[in-house]
């Protein structure tokens, strides 16, 4: 039986999954974690993730984090989101109109820019990349600091070679070194309409992309991994491939399918 509401969060300091592939379903959402190879020198995991969803209200709110030095910065971001969960979920319950996404953007920014959170960040060791993705109705909204990636896989977009939604940004972080402490705050936000039919959303930290021999540096290879294959098997195969290529960095994946029945923009 599917639950209408489910909340999940994890950070690598809780369980590191070094040498261990872990894949689990949260209703229709699949979360995959691999902590890297110990024989490549890995001994810790500083990734994190969060999943909220409500089927009745037709939304998902997910986040991946990729911290370095320690997992402290990822832990603080997860705590921040948890503290503001009620307000964020209220916004997500509203209609999928321009104003709703603008209010969500303003809320997320105000959280990261708050005096209290900035003071907390000054006392952590290390910093994190952060990618938040919201799917509401036939739209996705994203907020990104750093180099985590969101892909949108759809056959119509694949025809044009379009897979990646956000641009990876290096030298952006939240934590001890903090983009929101700078004179100008650097981050990326965007909204995109999904296509009619089956859309797959796929978030990942950089371990998958920067693996030795680069089996998945081309997003088309990730797209193809899901063709004629169950999603759990697809993600397991990706983890096995990076494991065999002796990846050191950890990888955290969140992925799910959305079938859009409504008409979408077309000339």
Predicted regions and their residues:
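PP2C/PPM-type serine/threonine phosphatase catalytic domain
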Residues: 1-267
């Amino acid at each position: 039986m599917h639950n209408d509401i489910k909340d999940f969060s994890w950070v690598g300091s809780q369980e590191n999954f070094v040498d261990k592939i872990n894949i689990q379903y949260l209703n229709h959402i699949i979360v995959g974690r691999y902590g890297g190879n110990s024989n490549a020198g890995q001994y810790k995991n500083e990734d994190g993730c969060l999943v909220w969803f409500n089927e009745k209200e037709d939304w998902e709110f997910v986040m991946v984090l990729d911290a370095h030095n320690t997992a402290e910065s990822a832990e603080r971001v997860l705590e921040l989101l948890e503290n503001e969960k009620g307000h964020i979920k209220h916004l997500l319950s509203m209609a999928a109109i321009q104003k709703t996404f603008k209010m969500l953007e303003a809320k997320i920014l105000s959280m990261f820019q708050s005096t209290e959170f900035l003071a907390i960040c000054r006392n952590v060791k290390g910093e994190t990349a952060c990618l938040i993705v919201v799917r509401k109705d036939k739209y996705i909204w994203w907020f990104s600091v750093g180099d985590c990636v969101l892909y949108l896989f759809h056959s119509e977009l694949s025809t044009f070679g379009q897979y990646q939604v956000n641009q990876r940004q290096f030298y952006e972080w939240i934590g001890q070194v903090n983009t929101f402490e700078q004179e100008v705050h650097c981050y990326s936000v965007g909204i995109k309409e999904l296509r009619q039919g089956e859309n797959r959303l796929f978030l990942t930290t950089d371990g998958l992309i920067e693996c030795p021999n680069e089996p998945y540096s081309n997003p088309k290879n990730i797209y193809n991994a899901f063709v004629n294959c169950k999603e759990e098997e697809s993600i397991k195969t990706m983890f096995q491939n990076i494991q065999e290529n002796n990846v050191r960095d950890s990888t955290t994946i969140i992925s799910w399918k959305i079938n859009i029945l409504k008409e979408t923009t077309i000339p």
